Amino acid sequence: MIYKACIRKRCGGVCVGEELKPEKIQEIRLGDCPICGGKGTLKAIQFIHRIPYFGEVMESTVVCERCGYRNSDVIILEEREPRLYEVKVEEEKDLFIRVVRSKSGTIELEELGIKIEPGPAAEGFVSNIEGVLERAKEVLLMARDFKEQENDREAVRRIDELLKYIEEVKEGKKPLTVRIMDPFGNSALIGEKVKSRKLTKEEIRKLSKGPYIVIEPDEVPQQ
């Protein structure tokens, strides 16, 4: 059973944003809100983290002061190539491996069969493995409520198995393979156990890119 979702809830666990003080903070007025039409109520808040052994990462959050609309993204400020990062979570300390996920990043939780893909409502975040599991858990709980209303007992049973597996991963009792892939190089896993490699052109083509558009050199119209 594969669950695909754009997850917008809080990250849960211990976030990198809570561990590291931002080096720079900037607030920009953007004008009117596209959701509620509030005049001059939309603003962007930007701050920069310097993550050890990785570099500078900017978190940008757009907020409406009137209706509460909120959307976030993460941008790595140093030029990076399209990459795949992978780590095997085997013990509790692995839960603190850092996760930088931009709107263009795809996260796979292999043993759970869960894929978090980019989409119109996707948000970027800086967190850790535990935070990603909490996000997945929240989506599964929402799906469980929906399936209960439909009286789909088999789906509820399968979701309960996934929720149990997540708790066992957090307790260090079950393994979990975590991958993050980003065609723009704006996402990463950061830790000693993490393995990474450059994405192939075929892998890049297959990835969902959300609100972003990629133009291949051979697709540019001739003048």
UniProtKB/Swiss-Prot annotation:
Organism: Pyrococcus horikoshii (strain ATCC 700860 / DSM 12428 / JCM 9974 / NBRC 100139 / OT-3)
Matches recorded under PANTHER family: ZINC FINGER PROTEIN ZPR1
Stretches annotated zinc finger (C4-type): 33-67
InterPro entries assigned to the protein according to its UniProt record, in alphabetical order: Znf_ZPR1, ZPR1, ZPR1-like_arc, ZPR1_A/B_dom, ZPR1_jr_dom, ZPR1_Znf1/2
Family: Belongs to the ZPR1 family.
Gene3D superfamilies in the cross-refs: ZPR1, A/B domain, ZPR1, zinc finger domain
The protein, known as: Uncharacterized ZPR1-like protein PH1223
GO molecular function: zinc ion binding
Keywords assigned: Metal-binding, Zinc, Zinc-finger
Any Pfam family hit: Zn_ribbon_ZPR1
Transmembrane segment boundaries: none
SMART domains: Zpr1
